[in-house]
C-alpha cells in the first residue's frame, strides 16, 4: 500500500496534469502526446529524492512517470554539519534508479537540483562530485530564493485569483520557504513579478525533529517547536503587516505535511492524489486534525495509513511549522498542493523552450 507522501513509484501517462503558463484559448484536442518532447526534473532534498517526467499538454503539462524515495540525506546534519556515509549510500542508490530511468528515455531537456542538505553540509560539493562519478548525474545546488521561486511556480495554478494575496509555503526536510504572492494583475502568471516578499528558515521536518525529538512529542515539546519557528518568522511577518491586516489572503501549502493532513482529514486508507491536490481545508478542520495527531503515540502515527513508519517521527515537526505560520498569518482557508519544485522546474524548462507557443502541444 502506498502511504500518503511516501509512495515510491507512480507510473502512467495520465497520472496527473498540471497547468502551466501557456495560453488557455482554443481546443485542447491535439496529436498523440507521445510525439511531444519529454522533460525530466529531479529534486534532491534533505528527506526525499524525487524524479518527474512530463510532456507539454495544452496550456500545461502531463506527467508520464514519477519516482519518489525517502533517503534522509540530511540525517544528523544539524549536529555534525556533514552528510553521513550511510545517508550518502542510501541517496546514491536512489539516484542510480533515477539515472537508469532517465537514460531509458529520449529527453528534450532535464534539470536536476539539490537543496538545503547539500547547501549547508560541509561536504555537500564533495557528495555531488561522488554522485556524478557513480551515477553520471550532474546536480546543481540552488539557492534559497530560487527554491522559493520554483515552489511558487509549481503551485501557482492553485492560488485563488480573487484574493489580494497568497501565503505560499513549502515545508521541507532541512528548510522551509514562505512566499507572499500578490494577486495577478497582468494575466501573465509570472511568479517573480508577484513575489512581494519571501523567506527561507533553517527549520524543516528533519532539522526540527532532530532538535526537539520526533518519537515522544509531548504537548510542551510541541509548543516549543511552534515557538522556535514563530520567532524565526516574526520579523518577516511584520514586514507584511498591512497585507496581513486586510485578511484578504489564503494559505497555500506544498509538502508531505499538508498532504498528510489532508489525508488524515479525509480519512483516506490509501493515497488518492486527485482528492488531495487542490483540497481546501478550513481553519477549524486544520486545528482538529493537528490536535488529533499531537494526541497520538508514536506507534499510532507509525501505523496510521496516511503517515507510516517513515514519517511518524517527522509529521509533528511539520505540523509545528504549519502552526507557526498560521499564528502569524491567520486565515480561514488553506489549499493543499500535491506539487511543487519538480513541477516548477518542468514549467520553467517548457516555458524557456516556448512549447506553449508552438502548434501541436495537444491535450
Where are these regions (language model features)?
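Non-catalytic pre-domain segments flanking phosphatase-related domains
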Residues: 1-38
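N-terminal basic/disordered segments at the start of proteins
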Residues: 34-62
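Helical "lid/coupling" subdomains associated with nucleotide-phosphate turnover
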Residues: 36-39, 53-56, 72, 76-105, ...
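A short acidic Gly-Thr/Ser loop motif
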Residues: 43-48, 169-175, 254-257, 340
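Short acidic/polar active-site loop segments enriched in Thr and Asp
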Residues: 47, 108, 332
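Broad gene-expression machinery/nucleic-acid interaction feature
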Residues: 48, 66, 166, 173-177, ...
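N-terminal glycine-rich anion-binding loops that anchor highly charged ligand groups
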Residues: 60-72
